[in-house]
Amino acid sequence: MKKTKILLVSMTALLLASCGTKKAVIQQKPVQDNKVAQQTAPAPKDNKMESLVVMQRVADNALYQKNLVSNLTFTLNDGHKDITVPGILRMRKDEVIRLQLLIPILRSEVGRIEFAKDYVLFIDRIHKQYVKASYDEVGFLRDNGINFYSLQSLFWNQVFIPRQQKVSEADLSQFAVDESKAQAEGSTLISLKDGKMDYKWSVNPKSNQIVLTTVTYNSNTHGASKLSWSYDDFKAFGSKL
């Protein structure tokens, strides 16, 4: 993506009819050729296999690049108004995700948000403050089952399984695929449930690109909290779109 914006089948049955040959008052029933019948009967629909095909197509869209750098627009709502600043997104796969927030025009760094495998770092250069914590110490991330690899999948437009570094081909069967709304709403729904967590991905059935990721945490005490992550304006990058 050239620029990143961050915001806090129905089957119809085939009927075969056959007519017997009439001779006087005697009606003969034709002998059905089982071999022919087996060849002409429609094959049963394998929903599980179709789901795996969809998941494989989505997984195949994963970028193979190790490093990514992109300009971004960062918008934060402080409860009264939106504050928007330019920035730079730098990512090194399986190592770090760094968001640098810049002063407009001058483009000097005023803040930084950094996600590494075992910590989260927030730097406020204006007030000369910083916070470094583990993922378990950040309530929003902990409550929504988000760790470094989950965040990396969000940034890299991929599906993920909580607490796992990667999604292997053997893992694809864990996801549920619903293609019933692909024609009406233009998206295929992929879902995964993990305890109190619900993960959903809306996928463009033509490009097999994820266009929306939704993570919902259902708490007995605080109700439901939701994280929505949308994607658009895809650009070619290497041999991938």
Regions found by a protein language model. Name each.
Residues T21-V25, Q164-L241:
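Gly/Pro-enriched, hydrophobic low-complexity segments
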Residues G20-K81:
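N-terminal leader/targeting segments and the immediate start of mature chains
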